[in-house]
UniProtKB/Swiss-Prot annotation:
Substrate binds at residues 8-13, 68-69. The keyword Zinc-finger does not apply. One of its GO terms (biological process) is thiamine metabolic process. Binds 1 divalent metal cation per subunit; can use either Mg(2+) or Mn(2+). Its cofactor is Mg(2+); Mn(2+). This is Inosine/xanthosine triphosphatase. Signal peptide: none annotated. It is an enzyme of class 3 (hydrolase). It catalyses: XTP + H2O = XDP + phosphate + H(+); ITP + H2O = IDP + phosphate + H(+). Phosphatase that hydrolyzes non-canonical purine nucleotides such as XTP and ITP to their respective diphosphate derivatives. Probably excludes non-canonical purines from DNA/RNA precursor pool, thus preventing their incorporation into DNA/RNA and avoiding chromosomal lesions. Homodimer. Disulfide bonds: none annotated.
Length: 175
């Protein structure tokens, strides 16, 4: 059984990770543990590089906390231009897989508050009246009329980031 450490306590992210690992490695093949770790970037990262750095930092911090695991996984959401998205970083003892999620264009009224320094989650909670929306359907669920959620979009990115771990073609070439 794979020991998987999620570098988050966010239920939407944990569910995406759990679903993806079960789909790739089989139902019941993984034990998931979650840990709260720092990202080393602002609460609301801006740009692809800052957001990816946050996910990488979370993985590194989770590895320090639970070094005996088989996989460490982080999902960091950010703002890039006028859209929200996330980076998924997965590591085992010898490899890293990374994938960027789909992006969701955000309305100007939401972006204005985020650019003033507020994190997207609290802005969306005020806009919708849904407490802790970032731990639930997120802006994605709201603006896609529930057709997609944070979990469903993150799930796809986790599946993509897992590709190097179950496809031999990703293994380094032997010299």
């Amino acid at each position: 059984m794979h020991q998987v450490v999620c570098a988050t306590t966010n239920p939407a992210k944990i569910q995406a990770i759990l679903q993806a690992f079960h789909e790739i490695f089989g139902e019941g093949s993984c034990h998931i543990a979650s840990v709260a770790v720092e990202s080393g970037v602002p609460e609301q990262p801006f740009g692809s590089e800052e957001t990816r750095a946050g996910a990488r930092n979370r993985v590194a911090n989770a590895r320090r906390l639970l070094p005996e695991a088989d996989f460490w996984v982080a999902i960091e959401a950010g703002i890039d231009g006028d859209s929200t998205f996330s980076w998924v970083v997965i590591e085992n003892t010898s490899q890293r897989g990374e994938a960027r999620s789909a992006t969701l264009p955000l309305p100007a009224v939401i972006l204005e508050k985020v650019r003033e320094g507020e994190a997207l989650g609290p802005v969306m909670s005020r806009y919708t009246g849904i407490d802790e929306i970032g731990r639930k359907e997120g802006a994605i669920g709201v603006f896609t009329a529930g057709k997609l959620t944070r979990t469903s979009v993150y799930h796809q990115a986790v599946i993509l980031a897992l590709s190097p771990f179950h496809n031999a073609v990703y293994q380094p070439l032997q010299a």
